[in-house]
């Protein structure tokens, strides 16, 4: 398809595919290029588009369907795109791939499953990988774009979404303090098995707090038993990602694993409680505002932080008792409870 030809005005094209969190991190670049007098064009897939479509720092969006351009044709596609812009920033696999090493995996190319060989670094020792990959994600992103370390990853809700968020808090939540809990991320290690215990303990300790649990439709299984609790609003599969991100401004505390929701909250005043799994504090939350960063306590054959992508438990160490990832299981629930209570007074 036509990609618009050479832009007449000075324009940068920023290419970033992937999930919500990837796009939130990339959004930090947009105001930097606006300061330098660029028009900002973003080449993105549907998931990313949903997050940035209201960003005032974005002038143009090149939207493509996921896998519309086969992976083995991307370099050719990017070479063509480059000619249309005054500056071209290609960020695909700048984090996943470079700082989170990818294993063998199956991808669908032209409608057929194809085994893609993973990085040879996947078999390196934990120490070797840590030395290579313990780099802050935001710093790496800004360095690749050639802009200063002035970080502002941000979601921009519309006026209508802001109004909806305020009204939802007023009508659905009776407590003074609101804790939003992101139940799960995109990998098997991004779900916390002791969530129920933490919520139950906090509710018993204070009458001042209500919880909002969010996630995709599958996360509704994690909300079982809380449907009739007036101080727990179960919204997994009900709220869209934009509604969830718009509601962050109404929250006092945001809890969860390494997800796009936590990334979107990183510069907000709300207190963040992030549970690390495959990333280190240096990688993820080094520059976050008002944040408690939790790491797993030591366990046998300690693998944290692994700096690896996992597409299942064939590569991720699993706890037999809970069925969860060892890194997630061994984050101390008492630390989460304390952080919530201390920041909801």
Q: Where are each of the predicted segments found?
A:
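Catalytic machinery of carbohydrate-active enzymes
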Residues: 1-345
């Amino acid at each position: 398809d036509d990609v618009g030809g050479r832009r007449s005005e000075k324009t940068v094209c920023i290419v970033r595919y992937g999930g919500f969190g990837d796009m939130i991190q990339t959004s930090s670049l947009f105001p930097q290029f606006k300061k330098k007098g660029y028009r900002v064009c973003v080449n993105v897939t549907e998931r990313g588009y949903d997050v940035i479509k209201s960003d005032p720092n974005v002038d143009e969006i090149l939207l493509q369907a996921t896998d519309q351009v086969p992976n083995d044709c991307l370099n050719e596609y990017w070479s063509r795109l480059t000619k249309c812009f005054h500056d071209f920033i290609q960020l695909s696999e700048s984090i996943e791939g470079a700082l989170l090493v990818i294993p063998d995996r199956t991808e669908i190319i032209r409608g057929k499953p194809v085994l893609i060989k993973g990085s040879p670094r996947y078999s390196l020792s934990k120490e070797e990988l840590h030395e290579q990959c313990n780099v802050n994600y935001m710093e790496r992103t800004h360095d690749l774009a050639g802009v200063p370390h002035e970080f502002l990853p941000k979601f921009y809700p519309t006026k209508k979404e802001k109004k909806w968020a305020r009204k939802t808090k007023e009508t659905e939540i009776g407590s003074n303090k609101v804790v939003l809990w992101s139940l799960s991320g995109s990998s098997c290690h991004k779900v916390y098995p002791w969530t129920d215990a933490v919520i139950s303990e906090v509710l018993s300790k204070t009458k001042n707090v209500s919880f909002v649990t969010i996630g995709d439709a599958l996360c509704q299984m994690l909300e079982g038993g809380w449907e009739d609790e007036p101080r727990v609003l179960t919204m997994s599969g009900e709220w869209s990602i934009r509604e969830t991100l718009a509601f962050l401004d109404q929250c006092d505390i945001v809890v969860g694993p390494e997800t796009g929701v936590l990334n979107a909250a990183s510069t907000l005043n709300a207190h963040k409680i992030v549970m690390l799994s495959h990333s280190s504090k240096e990688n993820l939350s080094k520059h976050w505002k008002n944040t408690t960063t939790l790491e797993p306590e030591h366990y046998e054959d300690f693998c944290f932080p692994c700096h690896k992508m996992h597409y299942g438990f064939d590569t991720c160490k699993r706890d037999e008792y809970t069925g969860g990832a060892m890194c997630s299981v061994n984050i101390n629930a008492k630390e989460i409870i304390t952080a919530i209570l201390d920041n909801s007074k």
